[in-house]
């Protein structure tokens, strides 16, 4: 079973922490157990040298990384870089390790940020000289979990995919707000205004009332036949509301048709 990409992997070892604990002095040792660590790096070489030097230590000498070795290194004229002075002063173990790494060339890992008790940032870099390094990647140790920082390409790709999704969703919703009229062309739906709706309702009710009153008014008698016809029409209109509504709808449609013919088409 193949492992997922390293920038999608989370690694932790509760057993290791239960045995040794996790603090700034041994966070690089904890990191060296993860799949992010390169076993051919200079850190592994220094670690092997330290193990052999401790086994072959003569009486009176101190192993690599001890306080006496650090004092000797400082007395030998090793000057810490300006951006590393704080960590070198607070954590002598890392100062001694970086002193040894500065003598070598190749891949190495150093501690660049400490926020105890649960955050450390480790940097992978290529060393080409005592003061010449190239940053390759950063790793985060948050609590007991180790993560690899994503690349700029992955970050931009993720942001573009997210932007594309939301933009497509917005355009699909915007497309639902467009309506088309033969006389005026395409246009956006206007938001419903409560004031306009109430005015339109009042106008409609007023027009209906006027039409009803006008229909119920008797006309002068011009003859028996006309009087009977008008009375029958008024009675039918006042009794049958559906017929009155049909008459009103016909009148409104005639006005809308006249307005559409006179209107200038507006295209978007």
UniProtKB/Swiss-Prot annotation:
GO terms for molecular function: transcription coregulator activity. GO terms for biological process: regulation of transcription by RNA polymerase II. Pfam families: Med6. Disulfide bonds: none annotated. Keywords: Activator, Nucleus, Transcription, Transcription regulation. It is found in: Nucleus. InterPro entries: Mediator_Med6, Mediator_Med6_fun, Mediator_Med6_sf. GO terms for cellular component: mediator complex. It comes from the Eukaryota. Residues 227-238 have a biased composition (Low complexity). Residues 220-245 are annotated as: Disordered. Component of the Mediator complex. Component of the Mediator complex, a coactivator involved in the regulated transcription of nearly all RNA polymerase II-dependent genes. Mediator functions as a bridge to convey information from gene-specific regulatory proteins to the basal RNA polymerase II transcription machinery. Mediator is recruited to promoters by direct interactions with regulatory proteins and serves as a scaffold for the assembly of a functional preinitiation complex with RNA polymerase II and the general transcription factors. Belongs to the Mediator complex subunit 6 family. This is Mediator of RNA polymerase II transcription subunit 6. It comes from Kluyveromyces lactis (strain ATCC 8585 / CBS 2359 / DSM 70799 / NBRC 1267 / NRRL Y-1140 / WM37).
